[in-house]
């Protein structure tokens, strides 16, 4: 059983929901990434999604595009992301870490080498944004052989066929994008989320995490009534952008604690 699967079983047994924050490796500073990861855990995160910066993040809105540009300016690569996970693992062997990014850096490294090095670094899951399930059957199989959960995106526009395809090859959890558009979009409709999630559950018992449009404790709590976990990304990036000098780590921990408390209430 993978670390992510075990975590969701434990959450279900205790009646809790998962909290999955997204931060980007190298933003706002590569030297701070591991410290921010530990702050996420102290705040009550269940899984950490660590973003691998890419020069053309097509699924991301302006907030995450800005962070990708900053991280790339700092020279962050897929290799340095793996080094950050390795450093994080020196103090935390338990919290699952999912790498989230685009196919190009993985293709440049090679899927086989990536799987080997990611597992050695302590990566538990991988979500390749531009890798739809019907095109990534072999990639998913390679990840599973290496002991890494392949995680896939589904959206309001996903056909039942695509839902079935993702259900067949995904493990860990499925990331349901709660609205059309790019990350950081607003106008979250929790009723729409609640109506579509049962269609996914018809095909799989894999936990479902919902992201896009979740920006505060209230929206996280509302989504959690139908989802197994909530994902928060753009709001965290905004918080880190706006945090006074020297206060980013504490601001992040406080924000995550507020979300965790709301989910547990």
From Swiss-Prot:
- The active site is formed by 49, 60
Pfam families attached here? Trp_syntA
Assigned keywords, A-Z:
Amino-acid biosynthesis, Aromatic amino acid biosynthesis, Lyase, Tryptophan biosynthesis
Q: In which pathway does it act?
A: Amino-acid biosynthesis; L-tryptophan biosynthesis; L-tryptophan from chorismate: step 5/5
Entry's Gene3D superfamilies?
Aldolase class I (3.20.20.70)
One GO term of the cellular component aspect? cytosol
Which SUPFAM superfamilies does the UniProt record give?
Answer: Ribulose-phoshate binding barrel
GO molecular function terms attached to this record = tryptophan synthase activity
> Has keyword ATP-binding?
no
UniProt keyword annotation of Lyase present: yes
Xref: HAMAP family: Trp_synth_alpha
Its biological purpose is as follows: The alpha subunit is responsible for the aldol cleavage of indoleglycerol phosphate to indole and glyceraldehyde 3-phosphate.
Could you describe the subunit structure of this protein? Tetramer of two alpha and two beta chains.
Q: What is this protein called?
A: Tryptophan synthase alpha chain
Q: Which organism is the protein's source?
A: Polynucleobacter necessarius subsp. necessarius (strain STIR1)
């Amino acid at each position: 059983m993978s670390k992510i699967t075990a975590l969701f079983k434990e959450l279900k047994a205790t009646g809790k929901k998962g909290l999955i924050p997204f931060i980007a490796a190298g933003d706002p500073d590569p030297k701070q990434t591991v410290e921010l990861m530990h702050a996420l855990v102290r705040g009550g995160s269940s899984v950490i999604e660590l973003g691998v910066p890419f020069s053309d993040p097509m699924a991301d809105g302006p907030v995450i595009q800005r962070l990708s540009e900053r991280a790339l300016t700092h020279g962050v690569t897929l290799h340095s992301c793996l080094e950050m996970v390795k450093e994080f693992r020196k103090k935390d062997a338990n919290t699952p870490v999912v790498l989230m990014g685009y196919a190009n850096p993985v293709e440049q490294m090679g899927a086989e080498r990536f799987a080997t090095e990611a597992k050695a670094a302590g990566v538990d899951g991988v979500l390749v944004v531009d890798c739809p399930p019907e095109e990534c059957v072999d990639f998913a199989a390679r990840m599973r052989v290496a002991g890494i959960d392949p995680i896939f995106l589904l959206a309001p526009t996903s056909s039942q066929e695509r839902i079935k395809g993702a259900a067949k090859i995904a493990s860990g959890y499925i990331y349901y994008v709660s609205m059309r558009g790019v990350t950081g979009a607003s106008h979250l409709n929790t009723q729409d989320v609640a109506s579509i999630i049962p269609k996914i559950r018809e095909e799989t018992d894999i936990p479902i995490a919902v992201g896009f449009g979740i920006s505060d404790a209230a929206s996280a709590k509302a989504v959690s009534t139908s989802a197994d976990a909530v994902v928060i990304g753009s709001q965290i990036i905004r918080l880190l952008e706006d945090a006074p000098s020297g206060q980013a780590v504490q601001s992040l921990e406080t924000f995550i604690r507020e979300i965790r408390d709301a989910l547990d209430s």
